[in-house]
Amino acid sequence: MMTMQQTEFDSQFNEHIYRIVHVVHHQPHAFLGLHSFFEGSKVIRLWRPNAQQIFLELFGNIVEARRIHEMGIFECIVPSHTTAIDYKIFHQNGKLHFDPYAFLPTFGEVDQYLFGKGVHYELYHQMGGRLATHQGIQGVKFAVWAPNAKSVSLIADFNHWDGKVNPMRIMGYSGVWELFVPGLQEGEKYKFEIHTQQGERILKSDPYALSSELRPATASKIANIERFQWQDQAWMEQRKAKNWTSLPMNIYEVHLGSWKKKDSNSEFLNYRELAHELTAYCLDMGFTHIELLPIQEHPLDESWGYQVSGFYAPTSRFGHPEDFQYFVNYLHQHQISLILDWVPGHFPTDAFSLARFDGSALYEHADPRQGYHPHWHTNIFNFGRHEVSNFLIANALYWLEIMHVDGLRVDAVASMLYLDYGREENEWIPNDVGGKENLQAIEFLKHLNSIVHSKCPGSLMIAEESTSFTGVTHSVEKGGLGFDLKWNMGWMNDTLRYFSKDMLFRNYHHHDLTFGLVYAFSEKFISVFSHDEVVHGKKSLLSKMPGDMWQQFANLRLLISYMICQPGKKLLFMGAEIGQWNEWNCKSGLEWFLLQFPTHAGIHKFVQEINHFYLKQPALWQKDFSHESFEWVDFADMHNSVISYVRKGGTERLLCVHNFTPLYHSDYILHLSQFEHIEEIFNSDAEKFGGSGKHNLNPEIIRNEARSVIGLRLILAPLATLIFKLS
């Protein structure tokens, strides 16, 4: 007669089998693998769907397991001293290795606690597919967050992408599913098969994957990022103490896929090839930093990288993670800083990625008024969810700490700050106090910047923020968001609007030139002419310029030199320096052939020389964020469309004069004092740049009857910037 204990055991046993066979088991390790058995023995249980026969290696001998269920459950009774490393099983790929279900968890209680609180700042070591040595055995540990899933399985090359074979176990109440697979190696392709509460089985790429297949394929790949031998230790150490505010910062904004192609065709250059070519180019051209449009994995070329599917994976378009590490290392060895565009505000709706990851609104808000962006047709992160903010903050730290990137430019911050951004009146939900500010996003940004500055001192956090939100670059302690720098979108828009006007009528728009100085020191600004200004029918910078061809090139020289002279750090998007006529096209390389023509060679030489000039002039960068660095000489000459001011740094003073019309002034008087000597040291109208060559070889100093200096008499070249050294 069967005892109650035996009946209970049989019931639990059958329940285990049912859940394994139907792939709905939360704890497959509780049944599969190595377990204590009756009379001091142990039992190994194996699951091979529909298999008729299974062999395993036990203490060096091949033995056959007994099938105990027709769907493919097997067991083998073994001695009590058997351990996880005393037997091996055959995987579907035919390889013999240790049993995944005989190992302890790799995602521990501390991991669960920190993740639940949103403060697991080294989460990138624990989540996703990672090469690991666990209990002395090499393999790959997998962990994925899917709290609302009925079950999660690992599907990969080694198990022939069969979602029944390798169910994962959930770790407590964390929502994290885990599995360690011994013997797996670098290059293994994998995904997660998630059984949703709605009964669907969906296939998802790993949100924490370090590498991915080349689009359009979407599988994640196991990568080794520990093997690379970094040689930039001195750079990383110096970065911690670098006072970047008082140093030159001249950023070259680059889209890797279209900066240059192989042999003038559509094939991409590798990260290693790009490292050598871009480094040599930036050193020659006088750029101190490279800012890359997003290189995190993304499915669509035309998104330019701003719709990210793999936040931890350098895109495979240009090589492997190790190639990207080489890229960063090489830049640092040649004293060039690297900034990445980073997109924590939204993500694409592609079914293989983060969207409705476990069948529910997991990374995004459920309500489309909060969780869907109508302009970009993307999902918006739920910043108030600890696990989501942790995913993003750990991602920022991953790029800055592990991949040695020097800074992040946070994309579309305005869309994060405001709940009504891009929405009509009834398309958004007010915050808890009835306002339009996204309080959760604001708190996320403060948390992000605080942790980055704490853990990665010297790293730059830059905001692309297009509104007048107060305190973007103010410290968190003083109520700000804590960014280091902010793109000066207002100055950029005013400047480009002014330059688009007919030159003889610019006097009616003089305010566009001077208004930016009203707020120039309210934040720490970067003056930018970015990729956004040369696409979607906006024309290239050169094509925006009015006038005949000579005037267009002169205007472009004036535009760039005007930016160089203004307070703030600098950024220029690729292509402007060669005078590209066409808009930027992400599918083709820059039109380098233009440099064979004198006009384009002239603008190229101009950018090269003014960049190097900038680097040598502390007055143009040493006190960028202080009123002390700038003094108006004349901002009111609307009639002639001329402005003049002095830039200061240390003991140096530079007089900058800009003539925004094509008119030549042979006798232009400026009222200026407190100097005894003046020398023209840069002129954008130089013949070598394609200009008319109107120089001030010996500017006349005007004195009063007491022989005190009261002004200057200058020659003003047409459409030109003139820079003088005062002493």
UniProtKB/Swiss-Prot annotation:
InterPro entries recorded: A-amylase/branching_C (IPR006048), Branching_enzy (IPR037439), GlgB (IPR006407), GlgB_N (IPR054169), GlgB_N_E_set_prok (IPR044143), Glyco_hydro_13_cat_dom (IPR006047), Glyco_hydro_13_N (IPR004193), Glyco_hydro_b (IPR013780)
Catalytic residues (positions): 411 (nucleophile), 464 (proton donor)
Gene Ontology MF terms in the entry: 1,4-alpha-glucan branching enzyme activity; cation binding; hydrolase activity, hydrolyzing O-glycosyl compounds
Keyword Thylakoid carried by entry: no
Enzyme Commission number, as recorded: 2.4.1.18
One GO cellular component term: cytosol
GO biological process terms on file: glycogen biosynthetic process
The UniProt record lists the keyword RNA-binding: no
Pathway: Glycan biosynthesis; glycogen biosynthesis
HAMAP family (UniProt xref): GlgB
Function: Catalyzes the formation of the alpha-1,6-glucosidic linkages in glycogen by scission of a 1,4-alpha-linked oligosaccharide from growing alpha-1,4-glucan chains and the subsequent attachment of the oligosaccharide to the alpha-1,6 position.
PANTHER family xref list: 1,4-ALPHA-GLUCAN-BRANCHING ENZYME
Family: Belongs to the glycosyl hydrolase 13 family. GlgB subfamily.
Quaternary structure, from the entry: Monomer.
Listed name of the protein: 1,4-alpha-glucan branching enzyme GlgB
Organism (species): Protochlamydia amoebophila (strain UWE25)
Gene name of the record: glgB
